[in-house]
């Protein structure tokens, strides 16, 4: 079965094509992405209207490249991110997917963007066993219990304020590093001393929810430090901030796996590309005897391949197609795998 999937939840226009074999194996055939990030950079963040217009312009050419790469004429299924995400951006991808579904007379699946991030790892490491999932991106930070990609995902905890990726962008802006801030801040942090400045770790007290996160206080602490220490090394500030984020994320994720008695930790989402998070997760999983799975950096960021993978797992589990009347949902919770 050939599955074509569209991703348009934010500022990446992605088209992925995957093959679902009879034994449940999912093979990636094409992964094409067009980004409008440069158009948003001068505004210091994503502008929803610009993102929607960019999807309209990029979707056709990206679709053609994906079909050519895969050598596919007509897929057996069309899928799309139906939420969460920017309302206008989602509408572009969902409307296109429905149109292709109707024109090709094949089923349509509207699936969850966040589940897609988890499913991306399958391309690199094969079938996913029962896992604790740490999903970290610009708009989301969740701890999840993933029994399988075809079953409902259970949320263990999430951020009570800023997402981890959002904190990265805000601190990068504070340091004058521009937007998007994730990679440039990561690069700067590698030049600094992560022990030189110790920033607070939110939600880590004995009375705090062990599976909840908070990064607003950390962001404020960095701002106050920079204001009161104008001579401070930017590299040390970046390293101290990054260490605080990676410390909290990995500490809570490993604790969740140990609490549930699960032997695999999956880290996914855009922030999963961060070098220190990957390094510290590897160290702590080794100490705890856990298997760590993180997709290659390209599959951590938004793409259509991950949506194709998640749709494939839902189909293999017997999920019904979504009706063409299904509406996109900008606030779709992670526990809803699809809109059916």
From Swiss-Prot:
Substrate binds at residues 135-139, 169, 182, 186, 274. GO terms for biological process: tRNA threonylcarbamoyladenosine modification. The keyword Protein transport does not apply. Pfam families: TsaD. It catalyses: L-threonylcarbamoyladenylate + adenosine(37) in tRNA = N(6)-L-threonylcarbamoyladenosine(37) in tRNA + AMP + H(+). The keyword Nucleotide-binding does not apply. It is found in: Cytoplasm. Fe cation binds at residues 113, 117, 302. One of its GO terms (molecular function) is N(6)-L-threonylcarbamoyladenine synthase activity. Its EC number is 2.3.1.234. Its main location: cytoplasm. It is an enzyme of class 2 (transferase). CDD domains: ASKHA_NBD_TsaD_bac. Its cofactor is Fe(2+). Binds 1 Fe(2+) ion per subunit. GO terms for cellular component: cytoplasm. Keywords: Acyltransferase, Cytoplasm, Iron, Metal-binding, Transferase, tRNA processing. NCBIfam families: gcp_kae1, T6A_TsaD_YgjD. Belongs to the KAE1 / TsaD family. Required for the formation of a threonylcarbamoyl group on adenosine at position 37 (t(6)A37) in tRNAs that read codons beginning with adenine. Is involved in the transfer of the threonylcarbamoyl moiety of threonylcarbamoyl-AMP (TC-AMP) to the N6 group of A37, together with TsaE and TsaB. TsaD likely plays a direct catalytic role in this reaction. This is tRNA N6-adenosine threonylcarbamoyltransferase. It comes from Mycobacterium sp. (strain JLS). The lineage of its organism: Bacteria, Bacillati, Actinomycetota, Actinomycetes, Mycobacteriales. The gene is tsaD.
């Amino acid at each position: 079965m050939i599955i074509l999937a569209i991703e348009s939840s934010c500022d990446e226009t992605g088209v992925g094509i995957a093959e679902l074999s009879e034994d449940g194996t999912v093979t990636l055939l094409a992964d094409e992405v067009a980004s409008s990030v440069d158009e948003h950079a001068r505004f210091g963040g994503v502008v929803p209207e610009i993102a929607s217009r960019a999807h309209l312009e990029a979707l056709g050419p990206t679709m053609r490249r994906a079909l050519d790469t895969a050598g596919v004429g007509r897929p057996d299924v069309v899928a799309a991110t139906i939420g969460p995400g920017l309302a206008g951006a989602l509408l572009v991808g969902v409307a296109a997917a429905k149109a292709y579904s109707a024109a090709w007379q094949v089923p349509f699946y509207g699936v969850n963007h966040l589940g897609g991030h988890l499913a991306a790892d399958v391309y690199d490491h094969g079938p996913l066993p029962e896992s604790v999932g740490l999903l970290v991106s610009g708009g989301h930070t969740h701890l999840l219990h993933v029994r399988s990609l075809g079953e409902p995902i259970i949320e263990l905890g999430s951020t009570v304020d800023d997402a981890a990726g959002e904190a990265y962008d805000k601190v990068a802006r504070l340091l004058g590093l521009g937007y998007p801030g994730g990679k440039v801040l990561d690069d700067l942090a590698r030049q600094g001393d992560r022990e030189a400045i110790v920033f607070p770790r939110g939600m880590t007290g004995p009375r705090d929810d062990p599976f909840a996160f908070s990064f607003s206080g950390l962001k404020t602490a960095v701002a106050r430090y920079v204001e009161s220490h104008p001579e401070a090394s930017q590299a040390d500030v970046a390293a101290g901030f990054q260490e605080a984020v990676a410390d909290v994320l990995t500490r809570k994720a490993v604790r969740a796996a140990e609490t549930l008695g699960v032997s695999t930790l999956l880290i996914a989402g855009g922030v999963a590309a961060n070098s220190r998070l990957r390094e510290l997760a590897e160290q702590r999983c080794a100490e705890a005897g856990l298997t760590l799975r993180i997709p290659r950096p390209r599959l951590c960021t938004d793409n259509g391949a991950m949506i194709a993978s998640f749709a494939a797992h839902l189909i293999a589990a017997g999920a019904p197609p979504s009706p063409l009347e299904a509406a996109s949902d900008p606030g779709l919770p992670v526990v809803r795998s699809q809109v059916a």
